[in-house]
Each structure stands twice: as structure tokens, then as C-alpha cells.
């Protein structure tokens, strides 16, 4: 199970509808805070970690995550939860508001943390002082895309160290262009350490139906000749 393989700093990878959200909450509830729903209900430790979910503005506004919280008796309204702790759901546009949070648990949802902009800077600051996992359908297209997550996991101190160890730039272009990566065996090993794939079986079957209709045979014949 993906839940058994998750750890702090993991990337939970799966398509839409694969169950990433509920798996992430199950990890927070059980492995991070000692709760259980298996044989009998065991509540989380008292007090549990505050929970912050950074997601898309659409998911925040449609309360999609609120529905995922309910089975775990969690809510953004402390009065509706027996734990009375802080649960925050907000968008990536507001991630900078939470850089001073400490000793909480963060779920980063629906966004590849790539590049070197404000979101990545806030992400790296948050991960220094909190526990976290990241949910993504497409975690990275190139090794450069993994730099922020590798730094957050402590594999490299900064981008400069990563580039020095692994990146060869093309010398004949006016702008930085990666020519090749070196020591890819180490990169593959590091990615394997943090990437957890969801197993998702689509229970759909092909259904063919033949519909007999009238048509203009002459017109059809002329059309197919052109």
C-alpha cells in the first residue's frame, strides 16, 4: 500500500481520482499522529499537529478538501471536530502567509514545486520547520524540476550544489541550457527514496453498440472518393 511507504518528505504520485487526498490524510491521521480506524477507532494524540493543506484556489473554494476531512473527524471549524486544533485549507497564491508556522503538518497538493520563484522559496522555508508530503500527478519532467524537493529533503544544500554535481550546460548558447546530467544513478536513487506511486485500477469496460441508420448511398460514395 502507498500509505505504508509514505514518509516525511515523500511525493505521493497518482492520477486524478486515484485517492491521493484521502491517502495523505490517512498518513497524517495514523502515521504522524497515532490514530487508527482499522479494528477500532483510536483517536489521534492530544494535541495532534496542526494541519495545513496548500492546494488550488478551485479546490479551496469548492470545499473539495472539506469532504475528504470528514471521515477523519477533521474540520476547518474547530467546533465541528473533537480535536479542536487548527486545520487550514488555502491556495498556493497564499503560501507565503505560512512561512512562520512551526511544528505542523503540511500537505502540498496539485502543484509541482519547480523553478525558483516565491512559491518555491516559501515551500523551502516551510519544510525546514514542519513535517510534510507533496501530492502530484506529474512530479517532474527533468532532473532540474526535482531540485526544490531534493533540497527540502536535505539531499543538497542549495541549487548551486546540485548544479555543480549533476549539470553540464551547453557552452555554445547565449542562455543556460542543460546539455546533459551526470551521476544520474544517484539521482534515480534519491527519486526512488521519495516517490510513492499510487496503484489505481480503472474498472471500466468497453461497450460497443451498432446503430443502423438510413443514408444517401450515392452521396456517401461520392464523398469517400474525394
How would you describe each model-predicted region?
Residues 1-13:
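Conserved pre-motif I regulatory segment
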Residues 56, 70-100:
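Inter-Walker segment of RecA-like/P-loop motor cores
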Residues 21-28, 40-71, 140-145:
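Conserved Walker A/P-loop ATP-binding site and its immediately adjacent core
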Residues 17:
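Walker A (P-loop) phosphate-binding loop of P-loop NTPases
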Residues 6-8, 83-84, 96-104, 127:
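Short basic/glycine-enriched coil/helix segment immediately N-terminal to the Walker B
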Residues 49-50, 105, 122-203:
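Conserved P-loop NTPase motor "coupling/switch" region that bridges the ATPase
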Residues 133, 198-226:
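Inter-lobe connector of SF1/SF2 helicase motors
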